[in-house]
């Protein structure tokens, strides 16, 4: 399957993830629900991960099927929100008073989950890809 076709097929799913993440913004190093959400998706995709970095951070890994080389690359997304009220009116607006995803971290996290899912399904490469979900970036 051509990469762009599969990514296009995943678009609505990634959009749903972004909206779900948008509705549960958390700040600082206390992104417990967001971390739980990310870990549930990684588990759903059968991707191994370690958690607890800086409290709520996660590092996942997808190993390629073409050998056991030590080649690796890391992809990162931040997942914290900002301490500000959301004034938008749509179904996925913030459910956490005084917190909002106002700078795209919900989108960053959704895209990284999409990359992780895609590469776990299409692991015809050598080495490993690490997915770093970073809390408390703001």
At which residue positions do the language-model features occur?
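Acidic/His- and Gly-rich active-site-bordering loop/insert found
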Residues: 1-101, 110-113, 117-126, 130
